[in-house]
Amino acid sequence: TIQNHGGYLTNTNWKDPVYPEGSHLPEAKEFLSATKVSDDAFQYLVKYFEKQDEPTIICMFGDHHPSIETEFYETLLGKKQSDWGLEEIQKRYATPFIIWANYDIEEAKEVSISNNYLENMLLKQAGITLPLYNQYIEKVSQDIPAMNVNGYMDMNGKWHNYGDSESKTVSSLLHNYEILQYGYYSDSDKTTMKKLFQWK
């Protein structure tokens, strides 16, 4: 939410503050307390739509953890920031998500997915046919189950830096995805669009 996006030094007088036990981390306290309020608001939203007749789907997710005290993450991960590798960095981008509906949909737990694939999951839950662009994303997800700004996950759940021992299949999928994504969001660039239409 906008409320939870920062900064985290507002000294808000929370009615029921949430903070890491045994520590004095004001930024962490601010974020966790605001998250609790957002969680309560989400519960209110769901309870409202539970009573509505119109079919409704709600999706809530985060894209990364907040920029709060480094000490908080060092304690959480058990390592100094200087010793973090790709696996530890990725954990700062691992956030929960939920897709809820006021009618029966397919349920799943412990799903690992990246934000770029979440739209497809939502469309399929809603029974909407995937547009061509999303169909390609679906194809990519079959070989690359998750990706973000730092790297990608292979089918065994291991994270890699881009360009790090990529197979020909993965390299080709990522290259074509980059072209398609650029065209999808920047179709006014005619030169790049020509490259897009040359893609097979």
Regions found by a protein language model. Name each.
Residues 1-200:
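Solvent-exposed soluble domains appended to multi-pass membrane proteins
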